[in-house]
């Protein structure tokens, strides 16, 4: 079965996603099926279409497998994330902002992207008071587990 962006938009709306919300997505691209017409961009574009210009889309951009004690180098633009192809495709898109945390950064685009990602590097833990995770809570955001569990 070929999955189109239009079908994904319909499914997201049927799931209860809405225009203007703040949404953090954990994902497994393979859970969407054998073939998505348009690939990663179609899925990301479907999210952006549903959330609209007043929404904010976030993906974790964890790099704990790349930034290690043996190689303690982190680059906002260059360090890849290690948790999937969809978050990595999102990270590389124009206009996406990445929080400044060497191992647990978050990428965001949309109305609140800057507010959610700023000052993450000032925390002593990945989920401190300046973290995108805390700000997600403060802005009433939700987390979508797209084809993946809690492990």
Regions found by a protein language model. Name each.
Residues 1-7:
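N- or domain-start disorder-to-order transition segments that initiate the globular core
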Residues 4, 38-40, 124-128:
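Short, glycine/acidic-rich beta->alpha junctions
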Residues 5, 40-44, 83:
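Amphipathic alpha-helical segments in well-structured domains
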Residues 8-24, 29-32, 102, 140-145:
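N-terminal/domain-start segments enriched in small and hydrophobic, helix-friendly residues
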Residues 8-10, 43-44, 128-132:
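Short alpha-helical segments and helix-capping/turn motifs at coil-helix boundaries
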Residues 14-21, 49-56, 92-97, 136-142:
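Secondary-structure boundary elements
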Residues 16-71:
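N-terminal active-site beta-alpha-beta segment that forms phosphate/nucleotide-binding
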Residues 67-151:
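Internal, conserved structured core segments that host functional sites
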């Amino acid at each position: 079965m070929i999955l189109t962006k239009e079908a994904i938009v319909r499914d997201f709306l049927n799931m209860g996603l809405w225009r203007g919300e703040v949404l953090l997505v954990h994902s497994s691209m393979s859970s969407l099926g054998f073939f998505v017409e348009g690939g990663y961009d179609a899925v990301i574009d479907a999210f952006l279409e549903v959330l609209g210009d007043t929404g904010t889309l976030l993906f974790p951009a964890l790099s704990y497998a790349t930034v290690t004690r043996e190689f303690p180098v982190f680059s906002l633009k260059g360090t890849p994330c290690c948790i999937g192809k969809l978050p990595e495709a999102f990270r590389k898109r124009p206009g996406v902002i990445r929080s400044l945390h060497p191992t647990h950064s978050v990428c965001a685009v949309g109305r609140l992207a800057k507010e959610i990602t700023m000052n993450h590097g000032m925390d002593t833990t990945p989920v401190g008071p300046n973290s995108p995770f805390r700000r997600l809570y403060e802005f009433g955001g939700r987390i979508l587990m797209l084809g993946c569990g809690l492990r």
